[in-house]
Curated annotation (Swiss-Prot):
Subcellular location field: Cytoplasm
Cellular component, GO annotation: cytosol; nucleus
GO molecular function: ATP binding; hydrolase activity; metal ion binding; pantothenate kinase activity
Substrates-to-products reaction catalysed: (R)-4'-phosphopantetheine + H2O = (R)-pantetheine + phosphate; (R)-4'-phosphopantetheine sulfonate + H2O = (R)-pantetheine sulfonate + phosphate; (R)-4'-phospho-S-sulfopantetheine + H2O = (R)-S-sulfopantetheine + phosphate
Gene: PANK4
Activity control summary: Activity is strongly promoted by Co(2+), Ni(2+), Mg(2+) and Mn(2+). Activity is inhibited by EDTA.
Protein name: 4'-phosphopantetheine phosphatase
Signal peptide: none
Region of interest (Pantothenate kinase), ranges: 2-402
Record remark: domains: Subfamily II proteins have an EGMGR motif about 50 residues from the C-terminus. This motif lies near the metal-binding residues in the putative substrate-binding cleft 2. Subfamily II proteins occur only in eukaryotes, in two forms: as a stand-alone unit in plants, and as a C-terminal domain of pantothenate kinases in plants, animals, and chytrid fungi.
CDD domains assigned to the protein according to its UniProt record, in alphabetical order: ASKHA_NBD_PanK-II_Pank4
Length: 773
């Protein structure tokens, strides 16, 4: 987020000057490559949306061409790495106060060079008011779009594409935001938009919705009556007054009417019997704060009851609230949530959206881009370029609040392939990828934020070392450090800024920030070297395994999987060893492992299962490059193939830490096939299939996987899922329930986490699960 000089002391003119002189890459990023625009102008805020292309570096691997050569390949790297420029699509959303609209349009005009469009889609009440100004400044024709259609299109888009977009507000919780996991079936729902008035819309599908009701008593009523009662003209100042008021001084409560007899009615004595009821009889002056609070309760309760009645009428249990009246204000969300809970007896859920302020702009953009069919793609929030859900609490006072004089930002990257649920999830709506919610667990939150802060020096050092020929690598690495450090400080103050805070979101944010400053794969050369070493060891490891008896071999294969998983550059306990001892290898890793019984030990049950019929098809999610994939995973895969089980080996689509990528796995498999007839024939006969997950994360979200992978899982009838590594099997998916057998295994390489789980460093998780009949 770029501050616009808003300390509360300067004039709006000073703020404006400072905001517009900020570098364009801080606010209107990639503006020079903007292709299409949309704008949503409300009563006080403007939301600009634009689609641009982003050029960034990606690391690609390619097998060496050995044709016609008779050379000694033992000490040659297994593949070559090249860094290429890639162009991807990104959606940018910028939110700012209407005060700045003319200066912002001038700024856009000055930096606009590559736009392909002659039209800008516009929605919101201000679209008509500012039409001439926009056309004059940008020389683009304004096409006005229907407000409600845009809101609904925007709402559908964020619910589908942004995990943890929706949240419930719980007044007495810490923090007060409870984020919902992505529901695979978002329809039907009720959208209640509270602007000047209230509109209530039933949304049934992507394109089918109907206006079912509304009210003239909305945000405009609160503003208008509030101004008359308190002489306060500014909406946010009214909310600030309300946050400090005590409504019971003005409202008549049930206990004021019935005394102690209210209990026979089954009502709480604190319920409002009559809004402003005391003002007619009490001979006293009421404070502005109390009147504002009473007014807020009156209007929120009215809206809540109306929404609840419509939800029940249409048999809906999810109601999303948005509009100028909400805007993430705790005092407003609190009263609406209370009202919905009371009138529905807890059967209807009041939900709010992290990005509700952008819905109109997103919808207007989607309307203008229909010929490009943006809904055929999946999109992901780019944490590096988004300012997150900032505190808007009126309790802070208007002068201190981050909203005043700021530009809020949201960026969405278009993903290469559509993402869908893993078909083997037992109950997709209840699936939660993350094991620990750090917004809930203050002790864990403090530990992990400190852990990521302390690791920053090492990440910066690794990033610089990965680009020895770059003259500006150190400068870019410092920019990365500052950006990620700032994100961590934001999350210390506001753990809910980007939805549910988890170890996964901290890792993903770091990867986004590294990509932002053109460090696409800091571990590429480390992986190349370790893959080369491990490939040379592969024949010996397989020969050794083949000499063992069946039962002894099964344990050796599992220990090999676990030992391979030790080689994780993302774990400080391991990276310290690998950097200080270049001879630390596969056998040394085996000796590090906890002796049986392991911390979680289902090995006996797994061995018993192996004595039964072979699985039809195993889906394996691999973790690290090098020893892990080559000496741990591939021998395990080979054994499954020998049993008659088909194998789908799923690896990351893009790089993260030293995790193996799909591109690397193809080359590794090709090299192993050249040494091993079992793997060779399985690849040729398509009994071994290598696929990409659609992810570039060290963790695993089974609700956002490559559509092609999901189709293959269905087609091959996968009946075993193997998830390997701390990020995929412990930080995520430890509690994931599947409708087939599963194996989750990892070595705990973090002493704090191991102790929390009741173990020690290098404790072993081996969790074999069979679904209930």
């Amino acid at each position: 987020m770029a501050e616009c000089g808003a300390s509360g002391s300067g004039s709006s003119g000073d703020s404006l000057d400072k905001s517009i002189t900020l570098p364009p890459d801080e606010i209107f990023r990639n503006l020079e490559n903007a292709k299409r625009f949309a704008i949503d102008i409300g009563g006080s805020l403007t939301k600009l949306a634009y689609y641009s292309t982003v050029q960034h570096k990606v690391a690609k691997v390619r097998s060496f061409d050995h044709s016609g050569k008779d050379t000694e390949r033992d000490h040659e790297p297994p593949y070559e790495i090249s860094v290429q420029e890639e162009i991807t699509a990104r959606l940018h959303f910028v939110k700012f106060e209407n005060t700045y609209i003319e200066a912002c349009l001038d700024f856009i005009k000055d930096h606009l060079v590559n736009t392909e469009t002659k039209v800008i889609q516009a929605t919101g009440g201000g679209a008509y008011k500012f039409k001439d100004l926009i056309e004059e400044k940008l020389r683009l024709k304004v096409d006005k779009e229907d407000v409600m259609t845009c809101l609904i299109k925007g709402c559908n888009f964020v619910l589908k594409n942004i995990p943890h977009e929706a949240f419930v507000y719980q007044k007495d919780s810490d923090p007060e935001f409870r984020f919902q996991t992505n529901h695979p079936h978002i329809f039907p729902y009720l959208l209640v938009n509270i602007g000047s008035g209230v509109s209530i819309v039933k949304v049934e599908t992507e394109d089918r919705f109907e206006w079912v009701g509304g009210s003239s008593i909305g945000g405009g009523t609160f503003w208008g009556l509030g101004a008359l009662l308190t002489k306060t003209k500014k909406f946010d100042e009214l909310l600030h007054l309300a946050s400090r008021g005590q409504h019971s001084n003005v409202d008549m409560l049930v206990r004021d009417v019935y005394g102690g007899a209210h209990q026979t009615l089954g009502l709480s004595g604190n319920l409002i019997a009559s809004s402003f009821g005391k003002s007619a009889t009490a001979d006293q002056e009421f404070s502005k704060e109390d009147m504002a609070k009473s007014l807020l309760h009156m209007i929120s309760n009215d809206i809540g009851q109306l929404a609840c009645l419509h939800a029940r009428l249409h048999s809906l249990d999810r109601v999303y609230f948005g509009g100028f009246f909400i805007r993430g204000h705790p005092v407003t969300m609190r009263t609406i949530t209370y009202s919905i809970n009371f009138f529905s007896k807890g059967e209807v859920q009041a939900l709010f959206l992290r990005h509700e302020g952008y819905l109109g702009a997103i919808g207007a953009f989607l309307k203008g881009a229909e010929q490009d069919n943006p809904n055929q793609y999946s999109w992901g929030e780019n944490y590096a370029g988004s300012s997150g859900l900032m505190s808007t609490s009126p309790e802070l006072g208007p002068a201190q609040r981050a909203r005043s004089g700021t530009f809020d930002l949201l960026e969405m990257d278009r993903l290469e392939r559509p993402l869908v649920n893993l078909p083997l999830l037992l109950d997709p709506p209840s699936y939660v990828p993350d094991t620990v919610d750090l917004t809930d667990d203050a002790l864990a939150r403090k530990y992990w934020l400190t852990c990521f802060e302390e690791a920053l020096d090492g990440v910066v050092k690794r990033a610089v070392a990965s680009q020895p020929d770059s003259v500006d690598a150190a400068e870019r690495a410092e920019k990365f450090r500052q950006k990620y450090w700032n994100k961590l400080q934001t999350l210390r103050q506001q753990p809910f800024a980007y939805g549910t805070l988890t170890v996964r979101s901290l890792l993903d944010t770091r990867e986004h920030c590294l990509n932002e400053f053109n460090f696409p794969d800091p571990y590429s050369k480390v992986k190349q070297r370790e893959n080369g070493v491990a490939l040379r060891c592969f024949p010996g490891v397989v020969r050794s395994l083949d000499t063992l008896g069946w039962e002894e071999r099964q344990l050796a294969l599992v220990k090999g999987l676990l030992a391979g998983n030790v080689f994780d550059w993302g774990a400080k306990a391991v990276s310290d060893v690998l950097e200080s001892d270049p001879y630390f290898g596969f056998e040394e890793a085996k000796r590090k492992l906890q002796e049986r019984p392991w911390l979680v030990d289902s090995y006996s049950e797994w061995l018993q299962r192996l004595k039964g019929p072979p699985h039809k098809c195993a889906l394996i999610f691999a973790d690290n490059s090098g020893i892990d994939i080559i000496l741990g995973v591939f021998p395990f895969v080979r054994e499954l193939l020998l049993r008659g089980t088909e194998v789908i080996l799923a690896c990351n689509s893009g790089p993260a830490l030293n995790d193996v990528t799909h591109g690397e796995s193809l080359i590794v498999a090709e090299r192993i096939a050249g040494m091993d007839p079992v793997v060779h024939s399985a690849l040729r006969e398509e009994r071994l299939l290598l696929v990409q997950t659609g992810s570039s994360s060290p963790c695993l979200d089974l609700s956002r996987l490559d559509k092609g992978l999901a189709a293959l899982v269905r087609e091959r009838g996968a009946d075993l899922v193997v998830i390997e590594g701390m990020g995929r099997a412990v930080h995520t998916n430890y509690h994931a329930a599947l409708c087939c057998e599963s194996l989750k295994l990892a070595v705990i390489k973090n002493a704090w986490l191991a102790e929390r789980l009741g173990g020690r460093l290098f404790s072993v998780i081996f969790k074999y699960e069979v679904p209930a009949e």
